[in-house]
């Protein structure tokens, strides 16, 4: 043996990280961006398509779209049926006509209710066989003033009861209920009278509610006058408002209830026309009775 072979060559020291096949010990995941993923860690999902969307999504998406379309169709059909049934009971589209008002109309109409004596033209204007909106015709009936007047009447009644130390929610509720009940009774009585007299008129139930509700404007004026000036102010203002509403109702309803000849000023002849005239006078005459009955106990 020679001397050189008696000594073993010192082993080569491995430098950490010198082997490119060994990953960095501080790296949590393998870097697969530079090459193919090792076959040992490859777990292909054979149930997934190429875009990475599960195969069930392709099956469920058409079903969900169909369900959404079917549900929308059912909802729209149900809404149409509900609208038809509601419109059959309560003509919402027609009621909107009675609230087509503006500030100018409200001011003029209240002035007409309080001072109707100088007004000349009482005919309702039409456009293509349809009455124009109230904001374009002061003679057209509306529901805005009656509804607001009814609510204001309840508030003024509560104020009057409060000044007399008689206010309570129960009494105010009874006041509102009685006023509404008398209004319903009045409208039903007018409808029954029109049916018995067999009057062919274009008056609708909503028109009658509007005309019957105009008296609340005079009732409010009377109660406020009573609060400010006592019983004397109440009776004076209420008497004026009663005369005004009677005049207003006669001049308005005579064009609706009486015959065309009577509406034009021709002498009323015949038993049927006499009944229509009496009916018009009765509807107008009953307004002051309700006005006094619903307000006299509020002023003391």
UniProtKB/Swiss-Prot annotation:
Residues 1-46 are annotated as: Disordered. Signal peptide: none annotated. The chain crosses the membrane at residues 143-163, 179-199, 206-226, 228-248, 279-299. Residues 1-142, 200-205, 249-278 are cytoplasmic. It is a multi-pass membrane protein. It comes from the Eukaryota. It is found in: Endoplasmic reticulum membrane; Golgi apparatus membrane; Endoplasmic reticulum-Golgi intermediate compartment membrane. The keyword Transmembrane helix applies. GO terms for biological process: cilium assembly; endoplasmic reticulum to Golgi vesicle-mediated transport; protein transport; sperm flagellum assembly. Functions in endoplasmic reticulum to Golgi vesicle-mediated transport and regulates the proper organization of the endoplasmic reticulum and the Golgi. Plays a key role in targeting to neuronal dendrites receptors such as HTR1A. Plays also a role in primary cilium and sperm flagellum assembly probably through protein transport to these compartments. This is Protein YIF1B-B. It comes from Xenopus laevis (African clawed frog).
